Amino acid sequence: MPKGTGKVLAQNRKASHDYIIEETIEAGIELKGTEIKSIRRGSANLRDSYARVYKGEVFVYNMHIAPYEEGNRFNHDPLRTRKLLLKRKQIDKLFGQTREQGYTLVPLKLYIKNGYCKMLIGVAKGKKDYDKRHALKAKEAKREMDRAMKERY
């Protein structure tokens, strides 16, 4: 595979709907052989996953990576807890931010960069129902304005 940034292999689209993402951090992810092969095929899912700081390390939970078809007995557990690779200062910063009420770590994207699998995680705060409705109204208003401008010209 050529060096450089590759395509996004998995994306958590629901995160931007359910959370206000305040900051993003790129982290490496510790994987087994059959897991990386399965991810390169595009069979990873971030939908219900979340990250947490535990005993000075960051782990991602409920990230589903489908078993590799040719892996037979060497296959992995699809919902295994996986360690994220971050520097100590980054971990301490994330720990401080998530101790505040209402903040959590949400996996946003999974991609290949320079041959290594990386995950973009976000420090996020949950949206209330009225925030979601307000965002939907603003999106609809922008769409209407764009339609009107398109018809005008």
Swiss-Prot record:
InterPro entries with a match to the protein in the record: SmpB, SsrA-bd_prot, SsrA-bd_prot_CS
CDD domains (alphabetical): SmpB (cd09294)
A single GO BP: trans-translation
Entry GO MF terms: RNA binding
SUPFAM superfamilies: Small protein B (SmpB)
PROSITE patterns registered for this protein in UniProt: SSRP
Cellular localisation: Cytoplasm
Gene Ontology CC annotations of this record: cytosol
Keyword set, alphabetical order: Cytoplasm, RNA-binding
PANTHER family to which the protein is assigned, alphabetical: SSRA-BINDING PROTEIN, TMRNA-BINDING COMPONENT OF TRANS-TRANSLATION TAGGING COMPLEX
Family of the protein in this entry: Belongs to the SmpB family.
Job of this protein: Required for rescue of stalled ribosomes mediated by trans-translation. Binds to transfer-messenger RNA (tmRNA), required for stable association of tmRNA with ribosomes. tmRNA and SmpB together mimic tRNA shape, replacing the anticodon stem-loop with SmpB. tmRNA is encoded by the ssrA gene; the 2 termini fold to resemble tRNA(Ala) and it encodes a 'tag peptide', a short internal open reading frame. During trans-translation Ala-aminoacylated tmRNA acts like a tRNA, entering the A-site of stalled ribosomes, displacing the stalled mRNA.
Name of the molecule in the record: SsrA-binding protein
Species of the source: Macrococcus caseolyticus (strain JCSC5402) (Macrococcoides caseolyticum)
Organism classification: Bacteria, Bacillati, Bacillota, Bacilli, Bacillales
Gene that specifies this protein: smpB
